């Protein structure tokens, strides 16, 4: 009897199994398409309203420009209608007449950091390439108006946008992605929160192209689940989780002494953390595999994203909603204010005479910035008693966000006292931009102590100002920024305090520092806003091309 029942169940499973394998993906797609259809129906009214508002604002804007004179109108037209079509990987050129809606998922758009510079530079490049396109930013900054945000963009980044085609939709669920909301299982919690926030965004408007510029891979995967005909693009500043993070948990690994979680993979709690991170990394890989166009800010980030997302992206039909991707993961360096620094900071034989033996470290006082390592290295450098060390000074410039940062500054001051170098180290907290520029003019060396800095905008700023860099031998500063130019060095790399001390000695003892400064400034030209715009357009054109192919198809 038992054997017969077992045989019956086995035969049933053997027969039904293949059907289930076909049926489950079908149901999965059906659920996603149904939810997507519901969201489209729900937001059609707002879509029409946005198009009407853009048209009305465009008329008002043209009228105001006409009132100011033909010259102002011509300058504005030249500013936003001068980017040529560059074509896509399929050999076709998609002209400027594309007039769809590009949704930028950036819940903290008014923060004013490097990530926000990328967002606004991307929107400006998009406006110049497709003047008829509408750029919609999903943000959680309820306390500021469109006018206030755009004014801050001009003041903070000197980026001038075309106001009529920029709109903001305000999210009410941003708290779900705050680390403070998830004191435990923070990575998983914030990723789950991004799904809630993405639903909030799509409940406001379904865009024609969906772009994430903050690193919410789960939101992009959710978009693909709901709208299979909406191309997605990701600009990845850093992977949410990386292989280096996983390896750093093991004290015996090559990176077991680096990072804020170094060596924490031991014991029952440590092993549980490692399993949790490994499971999360697999989910993260699945989400990233669904993205049509992936851009990273550096070679380091590209390598880690390829390692995590690449294997699944190359599969065909292995996961519902994921198909083979022909678009390679591209490096698009973030825009840095190189031109502004070139104008503000002189690099010449005359200015060389005004440089001081100052080691300048510009960074927020966060634990990963590793200020302690730099202070210890500077103390070792002074102990050498070399000619370069006699009048050297270390200047730490950075912002203090909260009480935790204040405590770190206090501990650094204690360390400086313990090392008896108080009179050789200066702290400048929350310095203004003019003050920072003045230090960039005076200093000789720029320092960066962070392990695996994903890119390193501050290091590019050092180079643009003509400083000789001594940076951590990892991440973007090593692979992309402080590299040779014309076969000659632009700076030095280090890992330990001893190596940093040696790097300080080399940087301050160069026989011809002016030549190195010129090479450093030449190196920085690779990271201009113009170069970013060119690469950004090249990648976003792929999304427009996908949309052009999908357009004849009926909406799902």
UniProtKB/Swiss-Prot annotation:
It is found in: Endoplasmic reticulum membrane. Pathway: Protein modification; protein glycosylation. Residues 185-205, 455-475 dip into the membrane without crossing it. SUPFAM superfamilies: UDP-Glycosyltransferase/glycogen phosphorylase. It catalyses: an alpha-D-Man-(1->3)-[alpha-D-Man-(1->6)]-beta-D-Man-(1->4)-beta-D-GlcNAc-(1->4)-alpha-D-GlcNAc-diphospho-di-trans,poly-cis-dolichol + 2 GDP-alpha-D-mannose = an alpha-D-Man-(1->2)-alpha-D-Man-(1->2)-alpha-D-Man-(1->3)-[alpha-D-Man-(1->6)]-beta-D-Man-(1->4)-beta-D-GlcNAc-(1->4)-alpha-D-GlcNAc-diphospho-di-trans,poly-cis-dolichol + 2 GDP + 2 H(+). Residues 64-86 are annotated as: Disordered. Its main location: endoplasmic reticulum. It is an enzyme of class 2 (transferase). Residues 64-79 have a biased composition (Basic and acidic residues). One of its GO terms (cellular component) is endoplasmic reticulum membrane. Coiled coil: none annotated. The chain crosses the membrane at residues 8-28. It holds the Pfam family ALG11_N. Gene3D superfamilies: Glycogen Phosphorylase B. GO terms for molecular function: GDP-Man:Man3GlcNAc2-PP-Dol alpha-1,2-mannosyltransferase activity. InterPro entries: ALG11, ALG11_N, Glyco_trans_1. Keywords: Endoplasmic reticulum, Glycosyltransferase, Membrane, Transferase, Transmembrane, Transmembrane helix. It is a single-pass membrane protein. Its EC number is 2.4.1.131. It comes from the Eukaryota. Residues 1-7 are lumenal. Residues 29-184, 206-454, 476-556 are cytoplasmic. GO terms for biological process: dolichol-linked oligosaccharide biosynthetic process. GDP-Man:Man(3)GlcNAc(2)-PP-Dol alpha-1,2-mannosyltransferase that operates in the biosynthetic pathway of dolichol-linked oligosaccharides, the glycan precursors employed in protein asparagine (N)-glycosylation. The assembly of dolichol-linked oligosaccharides begins on the cytosolic side of the endoplasmic reticulum membrane and finishes in its lumen. The sequential addition of sugars to dolichol pyrophosphate produces dolichol-linked oligosaccharides containing fourteen sugars, including two GlcNAcs, nine mannoses and three glucoses. Belongs to the glycosyltransferase group 1 family. Glycosyltransferase 4 subfamily. This is GDP-Man:Man(3)GlcNAc(2)-PP-Dol alpha-1,2-mannosyltransferase. It comes from Neurospora crassa (strain ATCC 24698 / 74-OR23-1A / CBS 708.71 / DSM 1257 / FGSC 987).
